[in-house]
């Protein structure tokens, strides 16, 4: 199938990847855009893995403030160089991450960061639920595993579906940007302040 400039342009707009890489991906996938996106994502994962050990001493703090001024989120996004920290796609990623934190209120960045006590508590709850449903213990264990993976998607930032495109996770979003900009990137600390939630907690405490 002939790869047209229009096809390449459309893929570039959807992925942010360079024109030559988009053309190559479309050629590899016989012009199928969906498969080309998957191809680019897999290439991005490989690039991200190669760059994972590099030091990330530059970056910026992305912020998001809700229109009512009562909800604010901040995310520390790290990269290798000041040059990339000033790149439009890196800045946009930091803003998207802050918006994600504001919308979903994650507990941690990745599953390994989740407090073990919290995880064990959730596992026990899921196990008791499965047993109460009449499941044998060996089946209950498999059910627990599935529910824990679902729990990760709720509380771990990297595992969450991206609020602007739920077909990709935040990990996908990060790896896509690494593939485009060619540097290792890491999400550091994040914070979320919601005035309405704070007022409600104070009222309950009185």
Swiss-Prot record:
CC per GO annotation: cytoplasm
Compartments, as annotated in UniProt: Cytoplasm
Keywords: Cytoplasm, Elongation factor, Protein biosynthesis
Residue segments, region Involved in Mg(2+) ion dislocation from EF-Tu: 81-84
Pfam families for this protein: EF_TS (PF00889)
SUPFAM superfamilies to which the protein is assigned, alphabetical: Elongation factor Ts (EF-Ts), dimerisation domain, UBA-like
GO MF annotations in UniProt: translation elongation factor activity
InterPro entries in the record: EF-Ts_dimer_sf, Transl_elong_EFTs/EF1B, Transl_elong_EFTs/EF1B_dimer, Transl_elong_Ts_CS, UBA-like_sf
Top-level division of the source organism's lineage: Bacteria
PANTHER family: ELONGATION FACTOR TS (PTHR11741), ELONGATION FACTOR TS, MITOCHONDRIAL (PTHR11741:SF0)
Protein family (similarity comment): Belongs to the EF-Ts family.
Function of the protein: Associates with the EF-Tu.GDP complex and induces the exchange of GDP to GTP. It remains bound to the aminoacyl-tRNA.EF-Tu.GTP complex up to the GTP hydrolysis stage on the ribosome.
Protein name from the UniProt record: Elongation factor Ts
């Amino acid at each position: 199938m002939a790869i047209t400039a229009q096809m390449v342009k459309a893929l570039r707009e959807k992925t942010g990847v360079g024109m030559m890489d988009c053309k190559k991906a479309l050629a590899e996938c016989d012009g199928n855009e969906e498969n080309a996106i998957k191809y680019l994502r897999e290439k991005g994962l490989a690039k991200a893995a190669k760059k994972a050990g590099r030091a990330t001493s530059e970056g910026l703090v992305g912020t998001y403030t809700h229109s009512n001024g009562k909800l604010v989120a901040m995310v520390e996004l790290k990269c290798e160089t000041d040059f990339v920290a000033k790149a439009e796609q890196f800045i946009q990623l930091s803003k998207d991450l802050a918006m994600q934190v504001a919308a979903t209120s994650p507990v941690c960045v990745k599953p390994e960061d989740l407090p073990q006590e919290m995880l064990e508590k959730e596992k026990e709850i899921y196990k008791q639920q499965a047993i109460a449903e009449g499941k044998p213990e060996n089946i209950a264990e498999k059910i627990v595993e599935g529910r824990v993976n679902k729990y990760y998607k709720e509380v771990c930032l990297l595992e969450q579906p991206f609020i602007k495109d739920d077909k990709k996770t935040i990990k996908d979003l990060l790896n896509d940007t690494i593939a485009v900009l060619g540097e290792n990137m890491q999400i550091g600390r994040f914070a979320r302040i919601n005035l309405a939630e704070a007022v409600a907690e104070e009222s309950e405490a009185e």
